[in-house]
């Protein structure tokens, strides 16, 4: 069929009254699904720690499986976000091109029908949308940091771990010498709710640092030899210290059970 014989135009500009429907066109929001999956991974890590005997030599294989799943999920999420951004750009470009076209009316109908005037076609733009570049996972999350250090602090909750600039790196950590104290330097008691400073990375228990900063907007960091000035809003939850303390308590409990059992055997 010749173009002039088309009974209706191939495409026409977006009608002003259809803007509401056009606005509602979007990629499906999968953010809640991804957050649920991440939550399940965090729960799996907690279950692994809770259900594994502290005397177990290593949990590297289980951690590697969870890490692989987490990285795959993170990549899918990045691809989903990238697709969503492409759809937004597509709609923006389509709207701009459509708005530049003469509106469809009795005087322009035949011109659009014959092809003398043309308007963008959303379906064609979508089919010709550039393929997104391979997505990269988010590589600096608390969960990835925990997965990276878990095999090491499982064996020794007090081991010194280097700063994790890129926890997604496949290289093994080079564990440093020395020991990490699992007691707050302010309260001198075991951590209950450890908070870490985003300025200097020093850790204090919530009650301790709150009492130290009470009545002050800012104050010198209470850690000896630290030159930073801190405020309460500089502190965030420290999941790695929480994990250290949890594993240390489990190991101590097992040691107490072992000593009690040995005492009974002696009797």
UniProtKB/Swiss-Prot annotation:
GO terms for molecular function: protein serine/threonine kinase inhibitor activity; SUMO ligase activity; SUMO transferase activity; zinc ion binding. It is found in: Nucleus; Cytoplasm. Its main location: nucleus. CDD domains: SPL-RING_NSE2. GO terms for cellular component: chromosome, telomeric region; cytoplasm; nuclear envelope; nucleus; Smc5-Smc6 complex. Gene3D superfamilies: 1.20.120.1010, Zinc/RING finger domain, C3HC4 (zinc finger). Pathway: Protein modification; protein sumoylation. Component of the Smc5-Smc6 complex which consists of KRE29, NSE1, NSE2/MMS21, NSE3, NSE4, NSE5, SMC5 and SMC6. Belongs to the NSE2 family. This is E3 SUMO-protein ligase MMS21. It comes from Saccharomyces cerevisiae (strain ATCC 204508 / S288c).
């Amino acid at each position: 069929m010749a173009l002039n014989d088309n009974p209706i135009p191939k495409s026409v500009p977006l009608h002003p009254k259809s803007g509401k429907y056009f606005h509602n066109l979007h990629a499906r929001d999968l953010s809640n699904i991804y957050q649920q999956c991440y939550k399940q991974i965090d729960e799996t890590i907690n279950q692994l720690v809770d259900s594994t005997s502290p005397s177990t030599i290593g949990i590297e294989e289980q951690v590697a499986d969870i890490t692989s799943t987490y990285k795959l999920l993170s990549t899918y999420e990045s691809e989903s976000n990238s697709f969503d951004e492409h759809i937004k750009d597509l709609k923006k470009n389509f709207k701009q091109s459509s708005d530049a076209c003469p509106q469809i009316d009795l005087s322009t109908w035949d011109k659009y029908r014959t092809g003398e005037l043309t308007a963008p076609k959303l379906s064609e733009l979508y089919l010709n949308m550039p393929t997104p570049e391979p997505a990269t996972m988010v590589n600096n999350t608390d969960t990835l940091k925990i997965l990276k250090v878990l095999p090491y602090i499982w064996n020794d909750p007090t081991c010194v771990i280097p700063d994790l600039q890129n926890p997604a790196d496949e290289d093994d950590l080079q564990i440093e010498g020395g020991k990490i104290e699992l007691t707050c330097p302010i309260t001198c008691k075991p951590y209950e709710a450890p908070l870490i400073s985003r300025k200097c990375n020093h850790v204090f228990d919530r009650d301790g640092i709150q009492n130290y900063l009470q009545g002050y907007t800012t104050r010198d960091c209470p850690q000896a030899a630290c030159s930073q000035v801190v405020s309460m809003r500089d502190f965030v939850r420290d999941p790695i210290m929480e994990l250290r303390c949890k594993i240390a308590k489990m190991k101590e409990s097992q040691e107490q059970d072992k000593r009690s059992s040995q005492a009974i055997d002696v009797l």
